Structures are given as C-alpha cells and as structure tokens.
Amino acid sequence: FISECIAQTRHLIGTDKIIGLRISADEHEPDGIDAPAWLQICKRLNDNSELDFLDVTVGSMMGPGGSVHVVPPMQIEHAYTTPKAGAIKAVMDKTILVAGRINQPQLAEEVIAAGQADMCGMTRAMISDPEMPNKARNGQLGDIRACIGCNQACIGHYHMGVGISCIQNPLSGRELTLGPHTKTKKRKRVLVAGGGPAGMKAAAVAAQRGHSVCLCEASSQLGGQALLAQLLPGRSEFGAIVDNLHQEM
C-alpha cells in the first residue's frame, strides 16, 4: 500500500519534486508496528526508486503509551530516536531524516557525524529560536535560545485551539503584532521589579530597544520560580530558561 501511494504521488507531481515518507519507527503500543517490523518494511522500501528520503520518528496517537512520543516532553532524553534511525539507515540507501528532542545544532551535528541520519528535524527548536540556523552559521552557539521541551505554548496551545507560540519566545506566533523589535525614538529609564523569567525578558527587550534598564530582584539569584520548577522530577530542563535569558541580558 505504501508503495502504491508513493507511485501515485510521483505520477501526480512529476519527476522534478522530492518525495519523503514520515514513519514511526516504533509506535510504542501493544498493537502497533514495532522496530523490527519497520526494519523489514524499510528493506522493501529501499528498492523504491520513487522515494527520495525517509523521515524517522517514534510513537503514535493510538494510546497514551505512544502519544507521549508524538511531541516528546523534557523528561525524555535528547536525540533518543536516533538509534532507531541509525538502524534503518543501515538497511537503506535513502536519505534519512530523524526528529525527536534534537534541540541544538551541535547535537544535530553529532547525530549526523555518528552516521545515524543525514538530516535532523528541529521544529520546536525553530519556534523557540527562529534565528538558530543563522546563529549556528555565524558561530554564535551560546546565543541560541534552546527549546526545553516544556510543550506549554507550542503543542499545548495547539490542543487549546489557540495560536502556537513559545514560553521563551513571546514573539513566536505574534510576529505581525509584536515584532521585530525596533529601536525607540525616546530613550527612557525603565525599572523592572522582579527577576523571574518575565522580568528578565522584559528587561532584555527594553534594553534591546535602547532604554536604560534597572532590573531589581530581592533574592540573590535571577530566575524566580523557574529555579524551583527545575527541582521537580523530570523537569530539570526548566532551569535552561534562566540560562537562555542570561544570554539575552
């Protein structure tokens, strides 16, 4: 059936377009297609000359066991799908793209260098920092606002029926109304009370626009409740919010 779909797609779009197929290399469900079964399927797909690349993920929407992997949260380790992508790449001559908690360009480079994939998909990472490719190209890795996998304003907003955004990047999804930041014509002195994530972001934006900013925090450390959130089991990556904001200030 897959081969028939690929053949019909090729017939409709012609030979000058690229055809890719996204698969779940392990659906993580009792009745789902598991990794060994997909390896056998991929061996057969390897002979399909009309397929240009394979996009490898894991999980499914059949139940809670698989659905958590559709948009994997922060408690799941980075680049955890790459071993399955590497196993598929070993039996195929096609270009392999892999996605799944790959949130930094240097991590993507490690995956590709290890021969586990040829390309990496980084959707939420691009929502968090649309300038990530340019920063990577210019050697500004420390300035990248890395996605933390919190799933609050991206997939969380999607399920609520509202526009996708990012808790670290309020411009995302609001580009036409909030951005890009422009330099102010009238420089002011700005006092920001509270050095939590909201206060840090407000101070950073005000400074970027050219204002003179004073950020006041009662405690000895910036970060607010994100410092507490990172102490919860499986939520340590919340602390990266503070690290990212420090880079912006």
Residue ranges and their predicted role:
Residues 226-249:
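N-terminal Rossmann-like dinucleotide/flavin-binding domain of flavoprotein oxidoreductases
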Residues 1-193, 197-213, 221, 229:
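Flavin-dependent oxidoreductase catalytic cores
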